[in-house]
Curated annotation (Swiss-Prot):
This is UPF0297 protein GK2555. It comes from Geobacillus kaustophilus (strain HTA426). InterPro entries: IreB. It comes from the Bacteria. It holds the Pfam family IreB. Belongs to the UPF0297 family.
């Protein structure tokens, strides 16, 4: 069986992030709104491409978001979304 037929596992470190992902995303979201951009489109563009040009320098948003790896941002977004969808 080739390695393409097997499910790969992706592991994150369980150490707390130095930078609060939620605070960074909210700051970036606010900066994008203030500049007149669609924040969701811009953040998705950044997450998919890795191109920091999607994020403005306003309120130091570009520098803030670049301190966090994109996979960490995606992980936090998925966790937040799925936790909100659980019906326990």
């Amino acid at each position: 069986m080739s390695s393409f037929d097997q499910t790969m596992q992706f592991h994150f470190s369980e150490e707390p992030a130095e930078t609060n992902v939620r605070e960074v995303l909210l700051t970036v979201y606010g900066a994008l709104q203030e500049k007149g951009y669609n924040p969701i489109n811009q953040i998705v563009g950044y997450l998919l491409s890795g191109d920091p040009a999607y994020i403005p320098r306003h309120k130091d948003a570009r520098a803030l978001i670049r301190k966090i790896e994109r996979d960490e941002l995606i992980e936090e977004l998925v966790k937040f979304y799925l936790q909100g969808q659980r019906k326990d």
